[in-house]
């Protein structure tokens, strides 16, 4: 494999990290006390030309953990009227996370990456809820880096001058249906599309692969 082809791999592009796009819907802003109600993850793959694309999607509605706080305003915002309704088909936090991590580990290994890194819109929020759920479930083998992320709010602010997901997507030339927004599944798919678009645009503009000094090869 040539130096250039080596650079056009997921492993090389993100310094050994395997990016996974995540979105959560919750019953408030406090990751320690408020319920995690929905989670979706989209893995990414890189084609032979070095362009990034969404790969696999995994999505769960989640049962509120025992004693979880449910803020009325948050439920109205995300449209989850009754978190305890059997019609949601919800699973426990542990079931959801274990299945998500199983998929991530499999695809991370196939990409020869050393660790997963979360990609999310306002990533600190999503990571805080995932980390809190990991602690509640006493999960030891967590694929995500505990604090490093790729935040598409920041990246889209740089690339498109917009930090709101809907506005960033529209500025990027993507379709965005506000009626579908605040569903973890829809928001994750759109965030994945946005992140891939930013990475691919940077490559198309000549930002990647880096031009290495001959003495460093």
From Swiss-Prot:
The similarity comment for this entry is: Belongs to the RNase T family.
Q: Indicate which residues the UniProt annotation says bind Mg(2+) 1.
A: 23
**Cofactor annotation remark:** Binds two Mg(2+) per subunit. The active form of the enzyme binds two Mg(2+) ions in its active site. The first Mg(2+) forms only one salt bridge with the protein.
Residue ranges occupied by any Exonuclease domain in the UniProt entry:
20-195
Q: Which UniProt keywords apply?
A: Exonuclease, Hydrolase, Magnesium, Metal-binding, Nuclease, tRNA processing
What gene is this protein a product of? Answer: rnt
Annotated residues for binding of Mg(2+) 2: 23, 25, 182, 187
GO biological process: any one?
DNA replication proofreading
Positions marked as site (Important for substrate binding and specificity): 29, 77, 125, 147
Q: According to its UniProt record, which cofactors does this protein need?
A: Mg(2+)
The protein's name in its UniProt record: Ribonuclease T
Q: Which organism is it from?
A: Vibrio vulnificus (strain YJ016)
Active-site residue list:
182 (proton donor/acceptor)
UniProt keyword Hydrolase, yes or no: yes
Q: What is its EC number?
A: 3.1.13.-
Give a GO molecular function annotation for the protein: magnesium ion binding
Q: Which InterPro entries does the UniProt entry name for this protein?
A: Exonuclease_RNaseT/DNA_pol3 (IPR013520), RNase_T (IPR005987), RNaseH-like_sf (IPR012337), RNaseH_sf (IPR036397)
């Amino acid at each position: 494999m040539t130096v250039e082809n080596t650079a056009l791999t997921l492993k090389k592009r993100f310094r050994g990290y395997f990016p996974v796009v995540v979105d959560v819907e919750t019953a408030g802003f406090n990751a320690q006390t408020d319920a995690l109600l929905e989670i979706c993850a989209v893995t990414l793959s890189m084609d032979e030309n070095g362009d990034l694309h969404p790969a696999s999607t995994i999505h769960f509605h989640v049962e509120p953990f025992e004693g979880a706080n449910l803020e009325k305003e948050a439920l109205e915002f995300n449209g989850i009227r009754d978190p305890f309704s059997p019609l949601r088909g919800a699973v426990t936090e542990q079931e959801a996370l274990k299945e998500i991590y199983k998929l991530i580990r499999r695809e991370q290994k196939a990409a020869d990456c050393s660790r997963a890194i979360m990609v999310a819109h306002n990533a600190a929020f999503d990571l805080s809820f995932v980390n809190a759920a990991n602690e509640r479930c006493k999960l030891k083998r967590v694929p995500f880096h505990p604090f490093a992320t790729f935040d598409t709010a920041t990246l889209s602010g740089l690339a498109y001058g917009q930090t709101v997901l809907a506005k960033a997507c529209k500025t990027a030339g993507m379709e965005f249906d506000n009626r579908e927004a605040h569903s973890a599944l829809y928001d994750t798919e759109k965030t994945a599309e946005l992140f891939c678009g930013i990475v691919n645009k940077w490559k198309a503009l000549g930002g990647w692969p880096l031009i290495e000094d001959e003495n460093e090869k």
